[in-house]
Amino acid sequence: MTFTIMTDSTADLNQTWAEDHDIVLIGLTILCDGEVYETVGPNRISSDYLLKKMKAGSHPQTSQINVGEFEKVFREHARNNKALLYLAFSSVLSGTYQSALMACDLVREDYPDAVIEIVDTLAAAGGEGYLTILAAEARDSGKNLLETKDIVEAVIPRLRTYFLVDDLFHLMRGGRLSKGSAFLGSLASIKPLLWIDEEGKLVPIAKIRGRQKAIKEMVAQVEKDIADSTVIVSYTSDQGSAEKLREELLAHENISDVLMMPLGPVISAHVGPNTLAVFVIGQNSR
């Protein structure tokens, strides 16, 4: 039986690619200067537009996908006897995953045999996107829903996410980083390198003076443990630094391909401009 793969706008997947690969995107929303912006569809807000507003002093807020939105999608699939695999934005960073679980319970009251599987990716941005790409490849190769789910869940503990943020104020403001860590990063051009740990929390792993040294440390962290030769690089604003990071990664003998994936508006709202991120699958668990 064929099945639908669905993920959030936080996966930062190109919408044309998603449509071509039969991936359903469901969007979080952004509130900025009294306006509510969509993050999927033809009227979605762009990251560049949002970042310009942030540079001008705006403080956007993001809203999780609510139960009703999930229920609508899940109910439609159940009514049409169509199986669905939903890869959710990290439960540590958003309540979206919990909303999906609640919606699933509501739908199963009327459709007890509905095939709806929900995976907490413990990931965001290119990491969530990476898992969705793997799921699409598995489905295209003939794997069924449960086999595809197993493949994704086996990779989650080995997915490594590294972030280099120019200004930690945005992460602190959104509650994604402690005030102490943010203050430390503001001292004397110290650039904390962050990663998502085994619990899905965003934590500093190194403190480096200067952006270029921090980028080199990011590459060094990636080189420690690589299982898949494909790496994803994401960025806001500074595409030039992202291209240099890509070149440094490609110089590694175990990396054959680096996908460039701009950070979408939801993640951009929390990290701000001049952010770099790398997503890689390691051999060992985090």
From Swiss-Prot:
Residues that, per the record, bind hexadecanoate: T62, S94
SUPFAM superfamilies referenced in this protein's UniProt entry, alphabetically: DAK1/DegV-like
InterPro entries attached to this UniProt entry: DegV (IPR003797), DegV_C (IPR043168), DegV_domain_contain (IPR050270)
Xref: Pfam families: DegV
UniProt keyword Hydrolase, yes or no: no
Domain DegV positions: 3-282
Gene3D superfamilies: 3.30.1180.10, degv family protein, Dihydroxyacetone kinase, domain 1
Keywords, ordered alphabetically: Lipid-binding
Gene Ontology terms for molecular function: lipid binding
Top-level taxon: Bacteria
Function summary: May bind long-chain fatty acids, such as palmitate, and may play a role in lipid transport or fatty acid metabolism.
Name of protein: DegV domain-containing protein SpyM3_1667
Taxonomy of the source species: Bacteria, Bacillati, Bacillota, Bacilli, Lactobacillales
